[in-house]
């Protein structure tokens, strides 16, 4: 996939950017490019990943400061053009803080940091994010977060359900998320935010390859 480039955004405090690059280049032969958060030129990338970590130290709230960066401002036109954006963990938090996805990520119900492999159900394949997977199919991905509890009001939940925007649900809810939600898409289907880490499940030697379904979807046209 030498002609296709995935941009990986790097904020102060990002710590999963190189993991994402390794997964895409090493496991899928997809070219990547690191994008410093102060950049606003996205013309030479075809898809974008907002990786996990602790952008700006997660001060105020997770993603609350990152949403003011020049690059996030440029995402408006990028998303409108139909190109794909994947937000993983802290990236999901940034997408909700920036208004690209509805709801919010708040502290886990038990107030503890959770690091574990979790079973998930694919609820919708809208936008082609889970290629070759059927709805309600089970996958296993790692989670690692302290503020991964997805919260939304009942009107928002109804909109998510009615418009088929819930991408993933936890089989056993680890953090208190509303309706067991682990990931959602926008209405156009080209933006996906999820708390689990697909880049940590892309090689059998590190526990599984279920993350490849999501990462491979970055090159869907």
UniProtKB/Swiss-Prot annotation:
Molecular function GO terms recorded: ATP binding; glutaminase activity; phosphoribosylformylglycinamidine synthase activity
PANTHER family: PHOSPHORIBOSYLFORMYLGLYCINAMIDINE SYNTHASE SUBUNIT PURQ
Function per UniProt: Part of the phosphoribosylformylglycinamidine synthase complex involved in the purines biosynthetic pathway. Catalyzes the ATP-dependent conversion of formylglycinamide ribonucleotide (FGAR) and glutamine to yield formylglycinamidine ribonucleotide (FGAM) and glutamate. The FGAM synthase complex is composed of three subunits. PurQ produces an ammonia molecule by converting glutamine to glutamate. PurL transfers the ammonia molecule to FGAR to form FGAM in an ATP-dependent manner.
Biological source species: Prochlorococcus marinus subsp. pastoris (strain CCMP1986 / NIES-2087 / MED4)
Entry keyword annotation includes Magnesium: no
Swiss-Prot/TrEMBL GO biological process terms: 'de novo' IMP biosynthetic process
Domain annotation Glutamine amidotransferase type-1: ranges: 5-221
InterPro entries in the record: Class_I_gatase-like, PRibForGlyAmidine_synth_PurQ
Keyword Transport: no
Protein name: Phosphoribosylformylglycinamidine synthase subunit PurQ
One of the Pfam families matching this protein, by short name: GATase_5
GO cellular component: cytoplasm
């Amino acid at each position: 996939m030498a002609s296709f480039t995935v941009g990986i955004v790097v904020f102060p405090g990002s710590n999963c950017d190189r993991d994402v690059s390794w997964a895409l280049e090493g496991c899928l032969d997809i070219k990547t490019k690191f994008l410093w958060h102060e950049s606003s030129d996205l013309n030479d990338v075809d898809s974008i990943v907002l990786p996990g970590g602790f952008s700006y130290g997660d001060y105020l709230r997770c993603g609350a400061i990152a949403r003011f960066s020049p690059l996030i401002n440029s995402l408006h036109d990028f998303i409108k053009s139909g190109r794909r954006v994947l937000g993983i963990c802290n990236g999901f938090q940034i997408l909700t803080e920036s208004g690209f996805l509805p709801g919010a990520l708040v502290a886990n119900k038990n107030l503890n940091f959770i690091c574990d492999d979790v079973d998930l159900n694919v609820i919708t394949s809208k936008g082609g994010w889970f290629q070759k997977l059927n709805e309600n199919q089970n996958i296993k991905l790692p989670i690692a977060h302290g503020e991964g509890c997805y919260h939304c009001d009942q009107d928002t939940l109804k909109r998510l359900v009615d418009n088929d925007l819930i991408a993933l649900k936890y089989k056993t809810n680890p953090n208190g998320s509303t309706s067991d939600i682990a990931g959602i898409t926008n209405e156009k289907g080209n933006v996906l935010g999820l708390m689990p880490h697909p880049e940590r499940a892309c090689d059998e030697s590190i526990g599984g390859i279920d993350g490849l379904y999501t990462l491979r979807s970055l090159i869907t046209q």
